Curated annotation (Swiss-Prot):
It is found in: Cell membrane, Sarcolemma; Apical cell membrane; Membrane, Caveola; Cell membrane, Sarcolemma, T-tubule. Keywords: Cell membrane, Glutathionylation, Ion transport, Lipoprotein, Membrane, Palmitate, Phosphoprotein, Potassium, Potassium transport, Signal, Sodium, Sodium transport, Sodium/potassium transport, Transmembrane, Transmembrane helix, Transport. A lipid is attached at residues 60, 62 (S-palmitoyl cysteine). Disruption phenotype: Adults exhibit increased cardiac mass, larger cardiomyocytes, higher ejection fractions (the amount of blood pumped out of the ventricles with each contraction) and reduced sodium/potassium-transporting ATPase (NKA) activity in a mixed strain background of C57BL/6 and 129/SvJ. Decreased cardiac contractile function and increased NKA activity in a congenic C57BL/6 background. Increased glutathionylation of the NKA beta subunit ATP1B1. Decreased excitability of neurons which secrete gonadotropin-releasing hormone and delayed female puberty. Homotetramer. Monomer. Regulatory subunit of the sodium/potassium-transporting ATPase (NKA) which is composed of a catalytic alpha subunit, a non-catalytic beta subunit and an additional regulatory subunit. The monomeric form associates with NKA while the oligomeric form does not. Interacts with the catalytic alpha-1 subunit ATP1A1. Also interacts with the catalytic alpha-2 and alpha-3 subunits ATP1A2 and ATP1A3. Very little interaction with the catalytic alpha subunits ATP1A1, ATP1A2 or ATP1A3 when phosphorylated at Ser-83. Interacts with the non-catalytic beta-1 subunit ATP1B1. This is Phospholemman. Residues 57-92 are cytoplasmic. InterPro entries: FXYD_motif, Ion-transport_regulator_FXYD, PLM. Major plasma membrane substrate for cAMP-dependent protein kinase (PKA) and protein kinase C (PKC) in several different tissues. Phosphorylated in response to insulin and adrenergic stimulation. Phosphorylation at Ser-88 stimulates sodium/potassium-transporting ATPase activity while the unphosphorylated form inhibits sodium/potassium-transporting ATPase activity. Phosphorylation increases tetramerization, decreases binding to ATP1A1 and reduces inhibition of ATP1A1 activity. Phosphorylation at Ser-83 leads to greatly reduced interaction with ATP1A1, ATP1A2 and ATP1A3. Palmitoylation increases half-life and stability and is enhanced upon phosphorylation at Ser-88 by PKA. PROSITE patterns: FXYD. The modification Phosphothreonine is found at residue 79. It is a single-pass type I membrane protein.
Length: 92
């Protein structure tokens, strides 16, 4: 028959093997920075190319604050010096 020492050694071996095979819960504070970096660079690259395409397509224009051009310059247009001349000629 087996001695109590052999049985104890067998139990210790079985317990150590059982604890080694037990699935470990993933640590919630361990992050995969490589995948996060690759994903971020991919999204940044796509947004960069999309921005360049929008700029080069000339379809995205400022719709507000545009006036129809009639060919005559507006009174507000021109240099600062010409606007001073207009104001001084009105006072006389």
């Amino acid at each position: 028959m087996a001695s109590p020492g052999h049985i104890l050694a067998l139990c210790v071996c079985l317990l150590s093997m059982a604890s080694a095979e037990a699935p470990q819960e993933p640590d919630p504070f361990t992050y995969d920075y490589h995948t996060l970096r690759i994903g971020g660079l991919t999204i940044a690259g796509i947004l960069f190319i999309l921005g360049i395409l929008i700029i080069l397509s000339k379809r995205c224009r400022c719709k507000f604050n545009q006036q129809q051009r009639t060919g005559e310059p507006d009174e507000e247009e021109g240099t600062f010096r010409s606007s001073i001349r207009r104001l001084s000629s009105r006072r006389r």
